[in-house]
From Swiss-Prot:
Transmembrane segments: 21-41, 72-92, 94-114, 135-155, 169-189, 200-220, 240-260, 263-283, 289-309, 338-358
Record-linked PANTHER family: PHOSPHO-N-ACETYLMURAMOYL-PENTAPEPTIDE-TRANSFERASE (PTHR22926), PHOSPHO-N-ACETYLMURAMOYL-PENTAPEPTIDE-TRANSFERASE HOMOLOG (PTHR22926:SF5)
PROSITE patterns for the chain: MRAY_1, MRAY_2
Primary location group: membrane
CDD domains: GT_MraY
Protein name, per record: Phospho-N-acetylmuramoyl-pentapeptide-transferase
Cofactor: Mg(2+)
Gene: mraY
Keywords (A to Z) from UniProt: Cell cycle, Cell division, Cell inner membrane, Cell membrane, Cell shape, Cell wall biogenesis/degradation, Magnesium, Membrane, Metal-binding, Peptidoglycan synthesis, Transferase, Transmembrane, Transmembrane helix
Function: Catalyzes the initial step of the lipid cycle reactions in the biosynthesis of the cell wall peptidoglycan: transfers peptidoglycan precursor phospho-MurNAc-pentapeptide from UDP-MurNAc-pentapeptide onto the lipid carrier undecaprenyl phosphate, yielding undecaprenyl-pyrophosphoryl-MurNAc-pentapeptide, known as lipid I.
Topology of this chain in the membrane: Multi-pass membrane protein
């Protein structure tokens, strides 16, 4: 909004020329989202405590150390959503369609997560919305986003799949691109949701992935940098760096309240929306496969659950002591902070590996 209001006045007031730089607006979005999180955080937490009473239900079959978390409010993802949406709308070019597509996924998935959290609290169990209903709604929203993306993106980028390490390879998926994009967005959303099981565990890898894709968005949206790196140039996607900056800032603000011992949990409101947002940004920038590397920690968590379920159904035996895999390490005797910090390190390493794909071609 500031870009649309102030940049046209740059001829009269030279300082407003700053708003044409995506890097400046990305920094502004980050700081704004951080400040919003700090300001509204205590108020949101007080409100959540007043309406939730006993807080998020704690799994009785989980690690015993988690029982002390009883009474901690959930749905803290609300403060992330508010900070991201307000900051993005304030600093982004409102004429940029890719930003609106990503916001559609972010808000849509956030509403689904909110409904899930609400039912968990009112029914006093850990189930919430049925898995089928959540899946159906997330698929529908992701399908709309994918179709919208195809409609506004020039061919062959619209239905093309870029492959890391190959500079000119763009596989045309045709209409199969829609189910593929749905898989990326819904898969990322659920993978992040599964990762959100310990204090601070999910939000830092989310910030790392957001910062990484903010850089990727900036580079892919810039014809000169894209040409130098020999990655596919998608005009307009540079504005997504502003969104990613807002996500990093909001994440930092949320971490202030989510650091061990957490004052509030993210809940599905935050995890579903943030995961969906990362998936959507990867689709817009043609780096869907790179997301599997950068977000490898999320992939690991999701795969551990699938392996555990498949193994138990087929053999009656469990591969891990408990799934997702972060609980496996807790059961092995690792303290919660040890698991969290080591997983943060893994996320940072994977982000560097993902960034290396931009140059290794």
């Amino acid at each position: 909004m500031l870009f649309n209001l102030l940049y046209p006045l740059a001829d009269e007031f030279q300082i407003f020329n700053l708003f044409r730089y995506i890097t400046f607006r990305t920094g502004g979005a980050m700081v704004t989202a951080l400040l919003i999180s700090f300001v509204i955080g205590p108020r949101v937490i007080r409100w959540l405590k007043s309406v939730q009473g006993e807080g998020q239900p704690i799994r009785t079959d989980g690690p015993e150390t988690h029982l002390k978390k009883k009474g901690t409010p959930t749905m803290g993802g609300l403060m992330i959503l508010i900070a991201v949406i307000v900051s993005t709308l304030l600093w982004v070019d409102l004429a940029n369609v890719y930003t609106w597509i990503v916001l559609l996924v972010t808000v849509g998935f956030g509403l689904i997560g909110f409904g899930d959290d609400f039912l968990k609290l009112t029914k006093r169990n850990t189930k919430g919305l049925s898995g089928r209903l959540k899946l159906a709604w997330t698929i529908a929203i992701a399908g709309v986003a994918a179709t919208w993306y195809i409609a506004v993106t020039p061919h062959p980028l619209d239905t093309g799949l870029a492959v890391p390490f190959f500079k000119d390879l763009l596989v045309n998926l045709g209409w199969f691109f829609i189910p593929f994009a749905i898989l990326v967005m819904v898969g990322a959303s659920n993978a992040v949701n599964l990762t959100d099981g310990l204090d601070g565990l999910a939000i830092v890898p989310i910030m790392i992935a957001a910062a990484t894709f903010g850089l990727i968005a900036y580079l892919s949206g810039n014809a000169i940098f894209a040409g130098y790196l020999q990655i596919h140039h998608v005009p307009g996607t540079g504005e997504l760096a502003v969104f990613c900056g807002a996500l990093v800032g909001a994440g930092l603000g949320f971490l202030w309240f989510n650091a061990p011992p957490a004052m509030v949990f993210m809940g599905d409101t935050g995890s579903l929306s943030m995961g969906g947002a990362l998936g959507a940004v990867s689709v817009m920038t043609k780096h869907e496969l790179v997301l599997a590397i950068v977000g490898g920690l999320f992939v690991l968590e999701a795969v551990s659950v699938m392996v555990q379920v498949a193994s138990f159904k087929l053999t009656g035996k469990r591969v891990f002591r408990m799934a997702p895999i972060h609980h496996h390490f807790e059961k092995k005797g690792w303290s919660e902070p040890t698991v969290v910090i080591r997983f943060w390190i893994i996320a940072a390493i994977l982000a560097l590996v993902g960034l290396s794909t931009l140059k290794l071609r």
